[in-house]
A protein has these predicted regions:
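C-terminal and inter-domain tail/linker signature
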Residues: 1-140
Length: 140
C-alpha cells in the first residue's frame, strides 16, 4: 500500500469540505476517493429520533461514486462554509492501522473560537491509498 501519513490525509480530506472552488472540490474528490467510493453518514441524533418515530429501525445516509460525493460535499459546503460563519479543520491525532485511518475534525467559527460541531471519521483505503469507504460519525 502507498505510504500515507494519517495526519496529511486528514488535512487534505478536511480541506476538501471547505474548498470554495467547485472544480478544485471535484478534483480533490477524485484524488481522495477510489472510483465507486462511498461516504456513509450516521445522521445526528435528532434525525435518528425522527426516523424512529416514523418506524425506521435505523437511518444511514450514503453517497456512492464521484457524482454523489460531489453533491454531498457541495451541499455541506453551501450549508456550513459558504455563508462565511464556519470552516472545518482536522484535529491532531489522526492514526493509521493498515488500510484504516481514524481522524477527528471540528467545525469552528471563521476567525477563531470554540468548536460548534465536529466528529469522527473512519476511512478505509485501497491499495493505492484512496478512500473506498468513509464512515462519518458527527457529534462532539
Amino acid at each position: 500500500m502507498t505510504d500515507i501519513h494519517a495526519q496529511d490525509l486528514a488535512a487534505r480530506y478536511i480541506a476538501l469540505w471547505s474548498e470554495p472552488d467547485a472544480e478544485l472540490r471535484r478534483r480533490a474528490i477524485e484524488e481522495l476517493w477510489a472510483e465507486g467510493g462511498a461516504h456513509i453518514l450516521q445522521p445526528p441524533q435528532e434525525i435518528r429520533e425522527i426516523a424512529a418515530g416514523l418506524g425506521f429501525d435505523s437511518t444511514t445516509l450514503q453517497a456512492h461514486g464521484y457524482d454523489e460525493l460531489d453533491v454531498r460535499v457541495t451541499r455541506s459546503y453551501e450549508r456550513f462554509v459558504a455563508p462565511g460563519q464556519f470552516t472545518f479543520q482536522a484535529r491532531d491525532g489522526a492514526v493509521r492501522l493498515h488500510d484504516v485511518v481514524k481522524l477527528n475534525w471540528e467545525m469552528v467559527p471563521v476567525g477563531g473560537g470554540e468548536a460548534v460541531g465536529g466528529g469522527l471519521e473512519v476511512l478505509v483505503l485501497d491499495e493505492n491509498g484512496r478512500i473506498t469507504t468513509d464512515y462519518m460519525f458527527p457529534g462532539i
